[in-house]
C-alpha cells in the first residue's frame, strides 16, 4: 500500500513512479538516485536535486572507468 511516505506528491505526475521503474529494471543504487533526483527536481528541491543527480553520475563515471581498467589488464 502506498502512502505519503512511499508515494510522495512530487512523483504522482508520472505514469510509473521512479522507485517502480528502478526496481523493475534492476538498476543499482547510483543509477536509481540519478533517476530519482532528475524526476523530482521541479517539484521538490530544485537545483539541489540536479546537483545530487550530477554527483551520482560522476560516481558512476568513476566506477565505470575503474571497471574498464580492470577489464583491460
Show which residues each predicted segment covers.
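Intrinsically disordered, low-complexity regulatory regions
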Residues: 1-73
Amino acid at each position: 500500500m502506498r502512502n505519503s511516505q512511499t508515494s510522495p506528491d512530487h512523483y504522482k505526475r508520472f505514469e510509473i513512479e521512479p522507485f517502480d521503474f528502478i526496481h523493475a529494471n534492476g538498476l543499482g543504487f547510483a543509477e536509481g538516485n540519478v533517476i530519482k533526483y532528475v524526476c523530482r527536481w521541479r517539484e521538490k528541491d530544485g537545483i539541489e536535486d540536479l546537483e545530487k543527480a550530477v554527483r551520482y553520475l560522476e560516481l558512476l563515471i568513476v566506477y565505470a572507468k575503474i571497471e574498464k581498467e580492470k577489464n583491460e589488464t
